[in-house]
Amino acid sequence: MHQVISATTNPAKIQAILQAFEEIFGEGSCHITPVAVESGVPEQPFGSEETRAGARNRVDNARRLHPQADFWVAIEAGIDDDATFSWVVIDNGVQRGEARSATLPLPAVILDRVHQGKALGPVMSQYTGIDEIGRKEGAIGVFTAGKLTRSSVYYQAVILALSPFHNAVYR
């Protein structure tokens, strides 16, 4: 059984990690241990590079806390131009897989508040009245009318980031 350290305690992210690992390695093939670690970037990262750095930092910090694990996984959400997206970073001590998620264009009313210094999650919670929406369906669920959720979009990115770990051509 793979010991997977999730560099987040966010249920939407943990669900995506668990589903993706079970899709690739089989049901019941892993145990997820969530840990809260620092990203080393602002609460609301801007741009692809800052967001990617946050995910990489979380993986490195989780690895320092739990060096005995088989995998360390981080999902860092950010804002790039007028959209939200995330970077997924997965490390197994030998190699690293990274993938960027799909992007969701955000309406100006939301972006204006984010550019004023507020994180997307609290802005969306205030907009929708849903407490801690970032730990649930997120802006993705709201603006796709539930057709996608934060977790479903992250799931795809985790699957992509896992590609180097089950395809020999990457080694």
UniProtKB/Swiss-Prot annotation:
Note on cofactor: Binds 1 divalent metal cation per subunit; can use either Mg(2+) or Mn(2+).
Keyword set includes Hydrolase: yes
Keyword Ribosomal protein: no
Sequence positions that bind Mg(2+): E38, Q68
Binding site for substrate: T8, T9, N10, P11, A12, K13
Function: Phosphatase that hydrolyzes non-canonical purine nucleotides such as XTP and ITP to their respective diphosphate derivatives. Probably excludes non-canonical purines from DNA/RNA precursor pool, thus preventing their incorporation into DNA/RNA and avoiding chromosomal lesions.
Protein name stated in the entry: Inosine/xanthosine triphosphatase
Organism: Salmonella schwarzengrund (strain CVM19633)
